[in-house]
Structures are given as C-alpha cells and as structure tokens.
From Swiss-Prot:
Mn(2+) 2 binds at D298, H303, H351. Pathway: Carbohydrate degradation; 2-deoxy-D-ribose 1-phosphate degradation; D-glyceraldehyde 3-phosphate and acetaldehyde from 2-deoxy-alpha-D-ribose 1-phosphate: step 1/2. It is an enzyme of class 5 (isomerase). Pfam families: Metalloenzyme. The lineage of its organism: Bacteria, Bacillati, Bacillota, Bacilli, Lactobacillales. This is Phosphopentomutase. One of its GO terms (cellular component) is cytosol. Its main location: cytoplasm. Its EC number is 5.4.2.7. Gene3D superfamilies: Alkaline Phosphatase, subunit A, Phosphopentomutase. Belongs to the phosphopentomutase family. It comes from Streptococcus pneumoniae serotype 4 (strain ATCC BAA-334 / TIGR4). Keywords: Cytoplasm, Isomerase, Manganese, Metal-binding.
Length: 403
C-alpha cells in the first residue's frame, strides 16, 4: 500500500542553491562555476522574500553561509535538503533525466558559438533555402524573430538558433514557410543531429505570424526529441498502471516516454500553476504522479542575468504556493526542487553547476526537519519506493524519512 496516494513534483527550473563540489569542472564565459550560487546571490544582492517556502524549510537547508534574507524555521512544516548531480552535464534534459533515475555519462552537445557550418550547409542543401548566419547563436525566441523576422519575410531565409540547452530551433513565418515545409526541414535536422559531434536533445519548430514589430509565436510548435536511453521511473510507473501527468515542457523533455497524461505547455509560470491546480483537482486523479516544470526563472531571467526579475519570479511562485498546498489531499506529497542552477549574477549566460534544493510537504506529516544531503535521482527512487515499482539506474529513497 502506498504511503502517499499522489505525489506532485514541481521543478523550479534553474533555482540552484550553491556550487556543487565539481562546479569548477564547468565554466561560464571562461569562468569556472565554483563560486556560483543562484539563491544565495539573489538573496544577497537584491533580497528574497519567500515566506511560504521558508515555512517548509528553505532557510534550513545546510549551506556554508545561510541565505541572507531567508531565515531558518525553528519548527518547519516539512522537510528540506539539497541534492547533488552525478551526471556529466548541467542542461535541462540531463537534470530532469537524472531526477527520474538516469546517470548521463555522455552529455548532449551545446553550441554556444552557434552551429558548425557543416550543419547549416546540409540544411540549406536539403531545404533549398539559405540560413541567416547572424541568427546562428544562443538567442531569445522572441528576440530572434523581432531581429530577423522582417528579413525572413523579404528573403525566405531560415532563422536557425540555439539556447543554453542542447537544442536546434528553426523559426519560420507561417505565411512565408508553410508548416508542412517547416516540419519537413526540422525532421531532416533531427536526422543529422543524432550523434557526436552534434548530439542534440531536441529540434524545435518555432512558427510565428504577424507583421514586423508585432510578431507572435503560434501554438503550432513541434518538438522532435530523443527518448531517454534507459527506462526511467516514469516508465516503471506507467508499466504498473499508475497515472503520470506532465505539466509544461516535461512531456517534451522525456519525448512522451512514461507519460500517459500530457497537460500541455505553459504560457507562463502562472499558467503552469493553473494547469497543475486543474490537474490536482481532477476527480479521476486518485492515485499517481504529477510532474511540473516552471521555466520562467531560467528562460526569462537566469540566462539574461536579470537578478531583480528572477527574484520577482520567485516571489510570484511563493505567493501562489498556498494555492498548491490548499489543493492537496490528505495523503498527497508535494516535492519542490530544481534541475540545475542559473545564477543571474554570474559570468556568461549559461547554466551553473549547483546543488538543487528539495522541499517536501504533506498534510499527513507528523514530523519535520532535514533529510540527509543526497543526489538528484533520490527523488525518483522515493517516488518508486512509494508506489512499489523498481527504481531506474541510480537513486536512494528517502521515503522512510518523511513521517
């Protein structure tokens, strides 16, 4: 019999809590990640007021220096710790896959200086369209169409860009490059990026409409991902007939593997929380696992090194946390964590190699306190333990610590 009928895992994308032990093996603009600290530096430089996460125990998580504006609770309402990454990567897919029990020993490739000429030339030859070379770099999806959409409307050239994650994205105005053609080009790009030196996690079609200065990305986005190389705990749950619900980009990250209810993409963190609340309220969701990703911290503020915006985004989540707690049933478990760091005060614009926080709350808790520091995959091991299924590759359950 399951200890908890339902477990809700919420990933605050990029909300790290201090440099990992191996952080100096990872760099940002040539600077090792060893001094990175997403929550610590936000708290120190612009202040952080997250009373609802603090009540659960955010300020109790062991650190060399306590979070400056998040006090430890003498009697928290839940359990807290921090978790270390084992896998050799600091991207979204690696973090999420490890959370679900995989050890990624060969990380995906990322292209901070843009894609090599060989890839662009192959796409040009296949499509019969030129590629705008100036867009070939890590770019905001809205900024890239603002900057190059007018040119695409005039010339029909392809807008190909990337991000901090191992993705190749192709933006195309629907009136200039029809959807069927865009999808066909993306399928070709997928076929040539399945092995090194260009092993990419996703190819993303990014269609848009409108006029210069007023472009809008449409819902016709399409992700061509790769499935995890080994069954995750999501697969184990699915095989056991236990419902799994994905909110936000979770379904894309796992290429649908092990997920039987995709609740759709988020338009924003707030929209994602709305979707989570809707999911939690489903009458048919009596037992199972929901997995939510809230990406605005990372996409809108971390990469853009906007500490004030990042702080405000954390405040907005914290203000809505009571709604999530109110939607919980007596035997629900809520786990709040992250997938990597992205210190908005740090060098460069890439993710940072950090510990991730873990907060655990349930209305059924009789106790509280700290869980021993562990690893990302301990989350999935705990989920597996609760529902009586096998773990994946790695992870140690902390279920017995939650009382």
């Amino acid at each position: 019999m399951s200890k908890f009928n339902r477990i809700h895992l919420v990933v605050l994308d990029s909300v790290g809590i201090g440099a990992a032990p191996d952080a100096n093996n990872f760099v940002n603009a040539g600077v090792p990640d060893g001094a990175s600290d997403t929550l610590g530096h936000i708290s120190k430089t612009v202040g952080l007021n997250v009373p609802n996460m603090a009540k659960i125990g955010l300020g109790n998580i062991p650190r060399e220096t306590p979070l400056k504006t998040v006090a430890a609770e003498s009697n928290p309402t839940g359990y807290a710790t921090k978790l270390e990454e084992v896998s050799l990567g600091k991207d979204t897919m690696t973090g999420h896959w490890e959370i679900m029990g995989l050890n990624i020993t060969e990380p995906f490739d990322t292209f901070w200086n843009g894609f090599p000429e060989e890839i662009l030339t192959k796409i040009e030859e296949f499509s019969g369209r030129k590629v705008i070379r100036e867009a070939n770099k890590p770019y905001s999806g809205t900024a890239v169409i603002y900057d190059f959409g007018p040119r695409q409307m005039e010339t029909g050239e392809l807008i190909i860009y990337t991000s901090a994650d191992p993705v190749l994205q192709i933006a195309a105005h629907e009136d200039i490059i029809p959807l069927d053609e865009l999808y066909r080009i993306c399928e070709y790009a997928r076929s040539i990026t399945l092995e090194r030196p260009a092993l990419l996690g996703r190819i993303i079609a990014r269609p848009y409409v409108g006029e210069p200065g007023n472009f809008t990305r449409t819902a016709n986005r399409r992700d061509l991902a790769v499935s995890p190389f080994f069954p995750t705990v999501l697969d184990k749950l699915n095989e056991a007939g236990i419902d799994t619900y994905a909110v936000g980009k979770i379904n894309d990250i796992f290429n649908g593997a092990g997920i039987n209810h995709d609740m759709g993409h988020n338009k924003s963190n707030s929209h994602g929380i709305d979707t989570l609340l809707k999911t939690m309220g489903l009458a048919e969701f009596e037992k199972g696992f929901s997995f939510t990703n809230l990406v605005d911290f990372d996409a809108l503020y971390g990469h853009r090194r906007n500490a004030h915006g990042y702080r405000d985004c954390l405040h907005e989540f914290d203000e809505r946390l009571p709604e999530i707690i109110a939607a919980m049933r007596e035997n629900d478990l809520l786990l709040i964590t992250a997938d990597h760091g992205n210190d908005p005060t740090y060098a460069g614009t890439d993710h940072t190699r950090e510990y991730i926080p873990l907060l655990a709350y349930s209305p059924a808790f009789k106790g509280n306190g700290l869980i021993p520091v562990g690893h990302f995959a301990d989350i999935s091991a705990t989920v597996a333990d609760n529902f009586g299924v096998e773990t994946a590759m790695i992870g140690e359950s902390f279920l017995d610590k939650l009382v």
